[in-house]
Swiss-Prot record:
Any GO BP: L-cysteine catabolic process to pyruvate
Name of the protein in its database record: UPF0597 protein YhaM
GO MF: L-cysteine desulfhydrase activity
Disulfide bond positions: none
Species for this entry: Shigella sonnei (strain Ss046)
InterPro entries from the UniProt entry: Ser_deHydtase-like_asu, UPF0597
Length: 436
């Protein structure tokens, strides 16, 4: 419950963060399909004997090359099978958290028997779409998710429609907390972070707890491309400096290594993405530790990072050709800059430099290599902060960067929302040809 004296706008900010910053086990695109399959299985009369699934091209892109936690296998078919046979239909993005060894074995057997199919939905106008249909003999149940990773819009069985979401908001119904972000500014977000009671935002410390645990697991060197562990090793060999810059990159990329490599630990996600949550969290945590920040100061920095990342991503399609680790790292740059000197000018300069640096990075699907992009984005964020502290930034005379940070963000998001759609189609075409 909110303090009744809390600024209504601040309440909306907090609700937006609570809506967008959630625990997630496994990459969220295959997990979205696993959730659809789990909910469908819960509606089915009898055990699942066969699974059919259809997904949007973008969801297919982000599900082709990523490891599903606990399985050692990559791709959407194993996600759909395990969701149907071992998923918790009530757990949202943690749908696979209770999957047993037997359920994993059964899912692999179903896959080996050719009883699982995943196809691209055609035609499909949705960026994020997943539909799972499970069968027991002639009986079936089908669940459709559209728009958001857990946004179930339809449940039906052979007996008829069980649930359908209304397409439009009922008159008088409260708007989504995210809607307010289209009418706010970074300056207003900073004022909120500086003045909101600590008790109202203490919950954001959970992002540090979850993502630090994931980072520690990644440093074991067992997961993905083990970038974090490799860089740490090179520090010991004297090939990389043992300093704050290295620590930011090592600990952030290690969390992504574990995430993308299939570790059975949840990430605290941001905007429906574990890697975005990691990128918005870990650089801020490392800098906070360096300066000996207490819990309140860490919470305010994390809130600025996560809310700024949501604010920017809210101007983008849910999935696009733009690697959103870059926009999450813009949030991290804001959080780190706030920890060092707290000035709006430093924060805005750091974000502008980020837009001038990494804005062209493409998303070519979720995979172990995401940790490379996460490490690059984290490094760029700290570099941008260091430049801003010296009163240096990419200016409005250069490229897509404008003299005003809000316009710079709008320019970047326009590029991703419009021109990069063709890039997205080309990426999907290339990846589909590899999968044949």
């Amino acid at each position: 419950m909110f303090d009744s004296t809390l600024n209504p706008l601040w309440q909306r900010y907090i609700l937006a963060v609570q809506e967008e910053v959630k625990p997630a086990l496994g990459c969220t695109e295959p997990i979205s399909l696993a959730l659809a399959a789990a909910v469908a299985a819960a509606e089915l009369e009898g055990p699942v004997e066969r699974v059919e699934a259809w997904v949007s091209p973008n969801l297919m892109k982000n599900g082709l090359g990523v490891t599903v936690p606990g399985t050692g296998m990559v791709g959407l078919p194993i996600a759909a099978a395990l969701g149907a046979l071992g998923g918790n239909a009530n757990a949202g993005l943690e749908v696979l958290k209770d999957a047993t060894a037997q359920a994993i074995a059964d899912a692999k057997a179903l896959l080996a028997a050719g009883k699982v199919s995943v196809k691209i939905q055609e035609p499909c106008n949705e960026i994020l779409f997943s539909r799972a249909k499970v069968w027991n003999g002639e009986k079936w149940a089908c669940v459709t998710i559209v728009g958001g990773h857990t946004n179930i819009v339809r449940i039906e069985t052979h007996n008829g429609v069980v649930f359908t979401q209304q397409a439009c908001v009922a008159e008088g119904e409260q708007e989504s907390p995210l809607t307010v972000l289209s009418r706010t500014t970074l300056a207003e977000i900073l004022k909120f972070v500086n003045e909101v009671p600590f008790a109202a935002i203490r919950f954001i410390l959970d992002s540090a707890k979850l993502n630090c645990a994931l980072s520690q697991e990644g440093l074991s060197g067992k997961w993905g491309l083990h970038i974090g562990a490799t860089l740490e090793k090179q520090c010991e060999r004297g090939l990389l400096a043992k300093d704050l810059s290295s620590s930011i990159v090592i600990r952030t990329s290690a969390a992504s290594d574990a995430r993308m490599g299939g570790a059975t630990l949840p990430a605290m996600s941001n905007s429906g993405s574990g890697n975005q949550g990691i990128t918005a969290t870990m650089p801020v945590v490392v800098v906070a530790e360096h300066f000996g920040a207490d819990d309140e100061r860490l919470a305010r920095a994390l809130m600025l990072s996560h809310l700024s990342a949501i604010y920017i991503h809210n101007q983008l399609p849910r999935l696009s050709a733009l690697c959103a680790a870059t926009t999450a790292a813009m949030g991290a740059a804001a959080g780190m800059a706030w920890l060092v000197d707290g000035r709006y000018e430093t924060i805005s300069m750091a974000i502008s430099s980020m837009i001038g640096d990494v804005s062209g990075m493409i998303c070519d699907g979720a995979s172990n290599s995401c940790a490379m992009k996460v490490s690059t984005s984290a490094s760029a964020a700290w570099k941008a902060v260091l430049m801003a502290l010296d009163d240096t930034a990419v200016t409005g005379n250069e490229g897509i960067v404008a003299h005003d940070v809000e316009q710079s963000i709008a320019n970047l998001c326009a590029l991703a929302s419009h021109s990069m759609q063709q890039t997205d189609r080309q990426i999907i075409e290339i990846m589909a040809s590899k999968a044949r």
